[in-house]
Amino acid sequence: MKWEGIVFTFLLIYSSSFGCIFFLTPLIPFVYFQPRLGRWLMDQMIWLWQLYAVFLYEKICGVKAVISGDAVYDDECELIIMNHRTRFDWLFVFSYQIRCGSLRHFKISLKEILKNVPGPGWAMQCAGYLFLHRNWEHDKSTISKCFMYFKKLNYKPQILLFPEGTDLTAWTKAKSDKFAKANGVEPYEYVLHPRTRGFKYFVEQMRDVNLFDSIIDVTVGYPINIPQNESDILKGNFPKEVHFFIKRHKALDIPSSEENVDMWCQKVWKEKEERLKKFYQDKKFHVKDNKIKLKDESEIQSLFKFANIFWSIFQISTFILLIYAPIIRWFALLSIGIFVFISKFGGIQVLLDSELESAKHYM
């Protein structure tokens, strides 16, 4: 077990938990009474924490992001689809998003169980992430409400979706191979067969509310070290590099019929399989015409420094105040109680209906 893994895990959990308690709890009323302002304030605080998370794993743990492929735009409404190699793809993709997309407007589709994780899960609720039950009727309603919410607030989300539904392990690969055999299709080695029903519905809903500029197809690869789960991170088994290959597809180029969207997704995943096969042979993506445009790295490094200073001061101050200031302890307990109560009744997401009604006044 390396010290980097312990320090990274502690600081990530400490900052997200107490940041949620002291910064996000006071913003919850704005979600109801001032939806646009509430969303903006929440996004600023989540963005500041995401910067800190990237600083920790890039600067403390030595992870390097390598990005290539098509140019993308940070002011577009995007559906980002990516292969799910490890349980930490969603975290490492921050490195791509901060350099190419909009980290403030970045949302993730995650498993429902994650929203109830004390601290980090509560922060994810406030971030506006989509939590899906794998109950189709329930999930359809959740997805529809989320896009109506973004539409009412004139908000341009960039949403990460993992069509495979889970990360690549020996067990999930066996299930994917079984599916392939049953359906007479080729088994994959480097990706899982995508579950296209959710993907098709995302595309449909984004079109319906006119929040659909492009699909960003991200292929992620780990040439050295693949941290599969939380224990790998705790042990300090971080990837030396995370490679992202980007293909941008204009919304107008995506088929309109549900059947053709299904076939399009299957085709994209077959291309991913072939691309990753070559990647793991050569330890890099081969790019004929690299059009990617990265943001100024010096500005990003300045943001990292700011985030590090901000969260370091906050964490030290919080530690001292929790010891010596009873009112701070009572506020922390009150905040925890609020999040436990809200989570028990569906989480921040249940406020979406109220937000939709309130947001009508801003249209």
Label the model's feature ranges.
Residues 4, 39-47, 140, 192, ...:
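Generic detection of long, well-ordered alpha-helical segments
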Residues 46-51, 117, 195-199, 239:
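A structural signal for well-ordered alpha-helical scaffolds and beta->alpha junctions
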Residues 56-231:
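Soluble catalytic domains of membrane acyltransferases
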Residues 49, 90, 108, 136, ...:
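Tryptophan-centered motif/residue detector
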Residues 145, 180-309, 348-363:
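Catalytic lobes of large eukaryotic enzymes
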Residues 1-78, 86, 91-92:
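Membrane-anchoring hydrophobic helices of lipid-metabolizing enzymes
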Residues 1-23, 295-349:
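Alpha-helical bilayer-embedded segments of polytopic membrane proteins, i.e.
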Residues 40-44, 48-49, 53, 331-363:
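Membrane-proximal, acidic/low-complexity disordered segments on the non-cytosolic side
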